[in-house]
Structure formats: C-alpha cells, structure tokens
Amino acid sequence: MSKKNPNLEDELSLFQDAVKGVKKFTHDTIITRRQQNSKVDKAKVSSKETQNHEFYFSDEFEPHLNEHGPTQYARTGVSKYEVKKLRRGIYVPDMYLDMHGMTQQEAKRELAAMLAACIKESVSCACVMHGIGKHILKKKAPLWLAQHPDVMAFHQAPLEFGGNGALLVLIDIPER
C-alpha cells in the first residue's frame, strides 16, 4: 500500500506549468586547459640557475684544506692570529645563514647572496650554519667559501655559534 502525498503532485504540476516555455540553454563558453610545465622547461630553468652561480663557486675546484682537526682556511697574506680570533669567538657574526634542508644549488645561491649582502652592509664576520646531517653541505661549504675572492678566512665556529655544524667567516670589506 503506497501513500502518495497529494501536495507533491500539485507542486510537480505547478513546477511543470512554470517551466513550460523554457528552451534549453546552449553552452557557449570555451574551457581551456592549463598548460603544464614540461620537464624540459624545468630543466632549462635549473640549468640557467646553475650557470649563474657557477661564476661564484665551482664544484670541481678543491682547495687544499686541512682534513684533520677543525675546518679552517686563511687566504694568502692573512695573519694566523685572525684565524685564531675566529676560533676563539672574538669576532662576533653580524649575519647568519642557515642552510639546513637546502639543496646544493640553493645553498650556493644563498651563500653568494649572503656574501654580497655582507659586503653591501659592511659586515666583516658572518656565520654559515651548514649542519651536520649527511655531511654534504658540511663538505661543500668550505670548498665554496675558499673560492670566493672576498673571503679572507674561515674557521669552525665555537659552540655558542654552532660548533661542528657552522663556520665563522671573515670577509674582506673594500674601503669606500
């Protein structure tokens, strides 16, 4: 036994009467698909970025750095006492760069930008925190820094500035 609501039938007939003369609407809007970046485009962008930063740092060049003991470097003509001041934490960094979680290309770009900012702002000491992790950036950061013409010296940072996971960098600021 089915019970039909007479109100439903009335409402349905009212609706059909209301839409009796309506014509079907034709759709004239064109839907365009978004172009997806292809892998080729991404490869071109990353190769351009690589070329821009190869000016500052090369992955093939490896300066002679002491493999035993803390990571340190002094450019020719820089006093060993300057390196000693870095080791003791006498130079306090005014600018910090944290490279945790960065790729090598990102780290190169940020390191170059930090050195340029240090020169622009006349900051003579900076701290580069490469972290310990898988030792990739820990090995690469000193090699890159030793190639930069404005880096006078660097030394593994004292514990208060990061210890094994950081370097204090002494930067040559040109006189204005």
Curated annotation (Swiss-Prot):
GO molecular function: RNA endonuclease activity; rRNA binding
Smr domain: residues covered: 97-172
Domain of life: Bacteria
Record-linked SMART domains: SMR
Keyword set, alphabetical order: Endonuclease, Hydrolase, Nuclease, RNA-binding, rRNA-binding
GO biological process: rescue of stalled ribosome
Entries under SUPFAM superfamilies matching the protein: SMR domain-like
InterPro entries, sorted: Smr_dom, Smr_dom_sf, SmrB-like
Record's protein name: Ribosome rescue factor SmrB
The organism of origin for this protein: Photobacterium profundum (strain SS9)
